[in-house]
Structure formats: C-alpha cells, structure tokens
C-alpha cells in the first residue's frame, strides 16, 4: 500500500485542470477554420475542395454579390480549404472548444461584389478576383496588365462572340477540290 502511495506522489498529477486552464495542443492540430474576408478573393477554390460541403457559394443577381457561407457543423477539419486557398485567407486555428447554443452560430458568411461584363453588363466574376489577377501579373513584371483590364472585365461569352468570324466571310469552296 505504501509503495502505491509513494508511486502516486512520485508521478504527480495525472490529469489537467482543463476548464480552469487551456489544454496545450500540438502545432499541427487542425482546429476551427477561420476565414479572413479582407484577404479572400471569392474564387471558390475552397468550395470545390471541401469534401463535406461545409462551404457553399451562391450568386445573388439582385444585389450583384457572391454569398460565401461556411457551416462549421458540417466541417470535418480535413484542411483541404486551407491547402487550396491562393491567398491564404483560410487558416485552421488551434481552437477546439466549438460548442454553441444556437445552430446559427455555426455559420460564417461573407459577401463579395461581382464584376459586370463591360459588353453585356451581366455579372460573371468577383471583382476582387479580377483585381487580384491584375495585381499578380504586375507583381510578376507584366507592365501592361492594367492596360488589359477591359479584357479581364469582359465575360467569356462576349470574348467568344468577339473572336468569331461572321459566317458570310467564310469561303467554304476554297477547301474543296474542283469537280471534274
């Protein structure tokens, strides 16, 4: 009996005083994902990578905005969103105490303004994403990037229409052999 008491005293405290002081977690711990809306460009790469569909985006044409939503209740803390984010706007934190009183507290939302096409005036992309692409080109030494802003702010459909050759200008007979 004395040997057991001696061993307990020598070992010390076996449990932590958790509610009173936080538990230390490993540096590679994957906790609650946190999104920085100022850094996010609304590219939706995280939405495509999320296996549990915890991230969603919807285009609201009435307001001209892209609605980004993160549901923490669906998250499996895999870290794919953090890996694919081009601007490092999503980081997995060390936070593990995620209990809430209401389901609505599990939701994080951000809204991003859409860019309207310069030709057809329909929204097609997030303005921050276009600005980010131009800034990235400038950073990599392309001095003409700002000059091509009009092209960046034109939707793919209008670009295709601009590049099409009218059918009355196509001469089909030049590719055919003459019949004898």
UniProtKB/Swiss-Prot annotation:
Keywords: 4Fe-4S, Electron transport, Iron, Iron-sulfur, Metal-binding, Repeat, Transport. FHL comprises of a formate dehydrogenase, unidentified electron carriers and a hydrogenase (isoenzyme 3). In this non-energy conserving pathway, molecular hydrogen and carbodioxide are released from formate. GO terms for cellular component: formate dehydrogenase complex; membrane. Probable electron transfer protein for hydrogenase 3. The keyword Ribosomal protein does not apply. One of its GO terms (biological process) is anaerobic respiration. Pfam families: Fer4_7. [4Fe-4S] cluster 2 binds at residues 75, 78, 81, 85. [4Fe-4S] cluster 1 binds at residues 40, 43, 46, 50. InterPro entries: 4Fe4S_Fe-S-bd (IPR017896), 4Fe4S_Fe_S_CS (IPR017900), NADH_quinone_OxRdtase_chainI (IPR010226). It comes from the Bacteria. The keyword Electron transport applies. This is Formate hydrogenlyase subunit 6. Residues 31-60, 66-95 form the 4Fe-4S ferredoxin-type domain. GO terms for molecular function: 4 iron, 4 sulfur cluster binding; metal ion binding; oxidoreductase activity, acting on NAD(P)H.
């Amino acid at each position: 009996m004395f040997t057991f008491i001696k061993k307990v005293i020598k070992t010390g405290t076996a449990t932590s005083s958790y509610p009173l002081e936080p538990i230390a977690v490993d540096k590679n711990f994957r906790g609650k994902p946190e999104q920085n809306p100022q850094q996010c460009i609304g590219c939706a790469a995280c939405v495509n990578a999320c296996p549990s569909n915890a991230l969603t985006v919807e285009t609201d044409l009435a307001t001209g905005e892209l609605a980004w939503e993160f549901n923490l209740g669906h998250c499996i803390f895999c870290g794919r969103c953090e890996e694919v984010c081009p601007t490092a706007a999503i980081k997995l934190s060390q936070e593990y105490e995620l209990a809430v009183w209401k389901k609505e507290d599990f939701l994080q939302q951000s809204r991003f303004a859409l860019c309207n096409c310069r030709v057809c005036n329909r929204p097609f992309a997030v303005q921050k994403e276009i600005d980010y692409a131009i800034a990235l080109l400038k950073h990599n030494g392309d001095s003409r990037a700002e000059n091509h802003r009009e092209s960046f702010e034109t939707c793919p459909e209008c670009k295709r229409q601009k590049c099409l050759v009218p059918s009355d200008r196509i001469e089909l007979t030049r590719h055919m052999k003459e019949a004898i």
